[in-house]
Regions:
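Blade-terminus and WD-like Trp-Asp/Gly-His loop motifs, strongest in beta-propeller folds
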Residues: 114-118, 151-162, 208-215
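Repeated scaffold domains used in trafficking and secretory/extracellular systems
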Residues: 105-112, 147-156, 199-208
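Terminal domain-start segments
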Residues: 24-126
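Beta-strand C-termini and the immediately following turn/loop, strongest in propeller blades
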Residues: 124-129, 162-168, 173, 218-224
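Surface-exposed loop/turn elements that mediate protein-protein interactions on large endomembrane-trafficking
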Residues: 81-103, 129-146, 177-195, 233-245
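Sec-dependent signal peptide recognition
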Residues: 2-8
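C-terminal motif of bacterial Sec signal peptides marking the signal peptidase cleavage site
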Residues: 14-15
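Short, solvent-exposed loop/turn segments at conserved positions within beta-propeller repeat blades
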Residues: 74-76, 127-132, 169-174, 232-235
Length: 245
């Protein structure tokens, strides 16, 4: 009887220890990433690990941005940008500025940033009273995908990523968005769908670079570093994370 009680006691003790280790590990991972994903269709797996400034700089030097800044080809005329859409019935997509040089809250100004020729999408930015956003526009269909900030195409054209706006703007999200490039079978048509959105709790990203199609390196700082230094963290406040997904 005593032996039986002893065996049961040991099993319970080991079980508690295992649960404690699992909880501790989960807390460590949460402390590192402090992120939650908001996928569109189903949960996506992602992982944050610490990397170095040297790795970040090396990846920056190697990476080539694929945005073609052919802004001279689509000039703004009388406050309006017109972009040709190559559908079954060719048409134009128009972006018109309003109320420039005023203090009206309805002010808006658009800028043609360029295009990703590899996936047939224009990039247009919109600046508003207290807001900024990016439009990723399909050149063949005119379909518009709304992004937080300026996008960057991955090395093999599988994904697009963009950060949030700089920390400190009231009401704006903090984090990173990742978009999947979908190619229609037996055609040259591309579409964009959200793959992953990560909203960290206590840190904010300031820069990023693609290391591969499934790995992004981020330069980040704790939210407190922004709050305690008028929105500009000290150099030593920054650290680097590797996002694998």
């Amino acid at each position: 009887m005593i032996r039986h009680f002893y065996i049961v006691f040991i099993m319970i003790l080991l079980s508690c220890k295992k649960d404690s280790q699992t909880t501790e590990k989960a807390q460590q991972v949460d402390s590192l990433s402090n992120g939650t994903s908001k996928p569109i269709e189903s949960p996506k797996q992602f992982e944050f690990t610490v990397t170095t400034e040297q790795d970040f700089i090396k990846a920056k030097a190697k990476f080539k941005d694929k945005l073609t800044q052919d802004t001279i080809n689509f000039p703004k005329i009388n406050g309006e940008i017109k972009l040709p859409i190559q559908g079954d019935k060719p048409t134009q997509l128009s972006f018109r500025d309003t109320l420039l040089n005023t203090d009206d809250e309805n002010i808006r100004e658009y800028k043609y940033e360029g295009q990703f020729k590899d996936i047939d999408h224009y990039v247009v930015s919109g600046t508003f009273w207290e807001h900024y956003e990016i439009y990723l526009i399909n050149k063949k269909t005119g379909e518009n995908t709304l992004l937080w900030n300026n996008p960057t195409l991955s090395p093999s054209n599988q994904f697009i990523a963009n950060l949030s706006l700089p920390f400190g703007l009231e009401g704006t999200p903090i984090g990173i968005q990742i978009w999947r490039i979908n190619k229609t079978k037996n055609t040259s048509n591309f579409s964009i769908s959200k793959h992953l959105e990560i909203n960290p709790i206590d840190w904010a990203p300031t820069d990023f670079v693609w290391k591969s199609d499934k790995i992004i390196l981020l330069k980040v700082a704790k939210v407190d570093a922004f709050l305690n230094n008028n929105g500009i963290p000290h150099k030593n406040d920054y650290y680097y994370l590797k996002l694998s997904f």
